[in-house]
């Protein structure tokens, strides 16, 4: 498995603003909680970027990332009501 990395300053901001961290994401990736992985819909602006849809505490989060030969770099964590409804059947 490739190394997973992220920006520590972004992680601190996500913990404060969204009460979720990249450590949470990595835990759920390892637990097999990825519902789907898609190409970013705007490949012109975000070339090569993909998005994991991950369940964390019964809520779906979008996690954009860039994958290289050496690592997977996590960009941010976005809570998604729309994806939660689609994949889980209801909002929390």
What is the meaning of each model-derived region?
Residues 1-92:
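Ribonuclease/tRNase effector modules and their secretory precursors
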């Amino acid at each position: 498995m490739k190394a997973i990395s992220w920006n520590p300053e972004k992680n601190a901001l996500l913990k404060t603003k969204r009460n979720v961290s990249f450590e949470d994401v990595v835990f759920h990736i390892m637990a097999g909680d990825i519902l789907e992985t898609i190409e970013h819909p705007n490949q012109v602006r975000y070339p090569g970027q993909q998005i994991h849809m991950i369940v964390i505490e019964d809520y779906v989060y979008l996690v954009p990332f860039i994958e290289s030969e050496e690592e997977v770099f996590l960009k941010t964590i976005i809570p998604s009501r729309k994806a939660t409804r689609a994949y889980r059947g209801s909002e929390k």
